[in-house]
Amino acid sequence: MLDFLGTKQRTHTCGELRAAHAGETITIMGWVNRRRDHGNLIFLDLRDRYGITQVVLDKDLSAEAHAKAEQARPEYVICATGKVRARSQEAINPKMPTGEIEIAATELLILNDSKVPPFSPAEEAIANEEVRLKYRYLDLRRPEMQHNFEVRHKVALAVRQYLSGQGFFEVETPFMTRSTPEGARDYLVPSRVHPGEFYALPQSPQLFKQILMISGMDRYFQIARCFRDEDLRADRQPEFTQIDLEMTFPQQETIFGVVEGFLAAAFEAVGQQITVPFPRMTYDKAIELYGIDKPDLRLPPMTDVRSVFSDEELQSLKIEPGMPIVAIVIPNKSAMSNTQKKAFGKEVEEQVGAELAYLDVERLRTSPQFALLADRIDAAAAAHCKLERVEPDHRLVVISPRLGAAAVSRDTSWVYKRAGQLRLELGKRFAAEHKAFEKKGTAADYQFLWVTDFPFFEWDEQSHTWTFAHHPFTSPHQDDLIAGRLESDQAAVRALAYDVVLNGTELGSGSIRIHRQDVQQQIFRALGMSDDEAKERFGFFLEALQYGTPPHGGIALGLDRIVMILAGASSLREVIAFPKTAKAIDLMVDAPTPVSDAQLRELHIRPTKQ
């Protein structure tokens, strides 16, 4: 029979009692983590969010409490009252913060029982993630998950406190708004009052936060929930949380300083240090050095060693002249046998494809014709990577377009991008040897970077049209506007856009916004949008821009991703309380589900089966 709590009150948590509390009479409450029955003595490990405390039920001390303990099983909810006593020296458990004490219970209440759980929260590793998600309330009891949400709380609190101290107002923007697709599909909400019309859940608060700047709010932030109906990947969720902010009259550096400030505060809140200010790098330079717009600075940059080749050497090696020849350094790669070298070379060639040639520098060194060339490549790569020389235990991979390759008609960025993919693949492949990704407990574990000056437009190969690289409310560079490049040279237009990157992961993206209606309409036209279409989709915003809109800009960073990195979690699902699967299903509540015909009729909807 279950007991009532009555007037009992918890005096301490299961994680706070220490040897200094010995002799005190206390009451703790929690879940039975483990139970060990030794006849007249029963040991219950009682668990709550704060830790675990051992409770001893001695039949000689209280037969009634001992009898209750005989009924208790894992995950029963228990209230235990008794005296704190120091454990004997041999019974101390150094692995537990409460390991020096135990509770000699004189009273035990069973407040609730439990079915046999499909897994125990005491288990350190649970292989089946679907079972964890179905029984999320059990999964969240696990210490690892409790830790993740402690980190999340501390990060969000630190961000709020920092931004509030910098004069930002936290303002909530609507969940139910109009559909203005920003690249992904909207989640739509049918209106009962307006048949055939729909609200949309926000993909971001983008236009509302810009309107807040038009409203004179000056500095806004929000821990914002966002929704995107897109194809899911391991690092995506249909609903997610971002740290969203906007400012009036900023320069890019103003925004950078604010972001660096709240990130430093957030990392410090969980005991981590970072180095500010973050380095800056243009998009073009990032592509040239790393082959990607979100570089991982923990690995050495790539080097274009084209200048060390003579025309005769290029011809002999059948390399396309005038194109990059990219050297990739893999640090601390141990020596390979001839068989391993052959297999390695084959693997590299498979990864880079038929258009690119792989040059084995060690093989060049053994050739009388190319031995000096190998030394020149080494010297160029070492200088660029700020090494005295390319050490013997470093592996140098050099790739370049083959003579006559079909792709050479394209711009040179494709070579850097392909080399960048190879650099990351090799970096992961040999991580155990170069140890660049291992944490050392210093600020160097977190390699931040600002990437700036992105292209404004991207060419869409499917539609054969230019589309926006960030979003259509990003301001182009002033010089590009004045030069008329929006109409004459769209590939050359730069955006006042910036990303903040950490260890090769994009944490956030932002920009200086368009604050003039004429420029905004010009951008819409450049994207192939007619004035009528722009008015239909964004008329309310174009109207607002006519009422003294100040220059403004902002950024949004993924809170879930920041917490995932700080908690050392392997997936966003580990830091979101009730996440969806890769198929956008909530296994715990079994959503989405069909709804009744009556509900559909109220919404004037008739489903069609595909």
Swiss-Prot record:
Site features described as Important for tRNA non-discrimination, chain residue numbers:
H38
Enzyme's top EC category? ligase
Task: Give the principal location in a single coarse category.
Answer: cytoplasm
Sequence positions that bind ATP:
R228, D229, E230, Q237, E506, G558, L559, D560, R561
PROSITE patterns named among the record's database cross-references:
AA_TRNA_LIGASE_II
By its UniProt entry, which CDD domains does this protein fall under? AspRS_core, EcAspRS_like_N
Pfam families assigned: tRNA-synt_2, tRNA_anti-codon
GO BP terms, alphabetized: aspartyl-tRNA aminoacylation
Identify the InterPro entries for this entry. Aa-tRNA-synt_II (IPR004364), aa-tRNA-synth_II (IPR006195), aa-tRNA-synth_II/BPL/LPL (IPR045864), Asp-tRNA-ligase_1 (IPR004524), Asp-tRNA-ligase_1_N (IPR047089), Asp/Asn-tRNA-synth_IIb (IPR002312), AspRS_core (IPR047090), GAD-like_sf (IPR004115)
Chain residue ranges for the region called Aspartate: 206-209
- This entry's Enzyme Commission designation comes to 6.1.1.23
Q: Which NCBIfam families match?
A: aspS_bact (TIGR00459), PRK00476.1 (NF001750)
Q: Which family does it belong to?
A: Belongs to the class-II aminoacyl-tRNA synthetase family. Type 1 subfamily.
- Record's PANTHER family? ASPARTATE--TRNA LIGASE, MITOCHONDRIAL, ASPARTYL/LYSYL-TRNA SYNTHETASE
Function according to Swiss-Prot or TrEMBL: Aspartyl-tRNA synthetase with relaxed tRNA specificity since it is able to aspartylate not only its cognate tRNA(Asp) but also tRNA(Asn). Reaction proceeds in two steps: L-aspartate is first activated by ATP to form Asp-AMP and then transferred to the acceptor end of tRNA(Asp/Asn).
Q: What is this protein called?
A: Aspartate--tRNA(Asp/Asn) ligase
Q: Gene name, please?
A: aspS
